[in-house]
Amino acid sequence: AVFDTAFHQTMPKENYMYALPYDLYSDHGIRRYGFHGTSHYFVTLRASELLNIPVDKLNIISCHLGNGSSVTAVKNGKSYITSMGQTPLAGVPMGTRCGDIDPAIVTFMQTRLGKSAEEVDAILNKESGVAGVSGVSSDFRDLENASDEGNERAQLALDMFHARVRETVAAYAADLG
């Protein structure tokens, strides 16, 4: 079996560690794993071929965008940093996943809104992202159509998605030099 996280096992420690107590990593494996590895690996190999650059010399930013989205910086043909984390919830907003948010929002929803851990998890994974912002759909084609018809929330969802992808790509471009 090939695990979808395998490509990202080359990330340096400073890019996969979270700024949490070290024992959460050493004893419990809490770290950035990344996802869509098979896709990013394929893009890396194909870019190497198309650009006629040996894979071990290739520096690119790979974007896997859609209902599930991730961005990966590939340095010398290996995953250097990726936007998804311990779970696929992290990173840029997606169809129904929120992407990166202030972690205290979880506690706020539990203590101030009375949501259980399971309810918060469902909100963040299944009711957020471009679908949650737009109130229309997790399908970007539907959002484009709704935006073209004047739906401001659909346009906002698209604008938010584009902004987070741009800032992630820009940060990764700086990482690659």
What is each stretch, according to the model?
Residues 3-8, 127:
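Short glycine-enriched loops at secondary-structure junctions
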Residues 7-110:
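Glycine-rich phosphate-binding loop of actin/hexokinase-like ATP-binding domains
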Residues 47-54, 169-177:
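Phosphate/pyrophosphate-binding loops at sites that engage ATP/ADP/AMP, CoA/4′-phosphopantetheine
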Residues 109-136:
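Oxyanion-binding "anion nests"
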Residues 122, 129-133, 140-175:
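Adenine-nucleotide phosphate-binding core of ATP-dependent small-molecule kinases
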Residues 50-57, 112-119, 146-153:
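Short, glycine- and charge-enriched coil/turn segments that flank and shape catalytic ligand pockets
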Residues 34-42, 69, 100-104, 115, ...:
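Conserved active-site and cofactor/substrate-binding residues in soluble primary-metabolism enzymes
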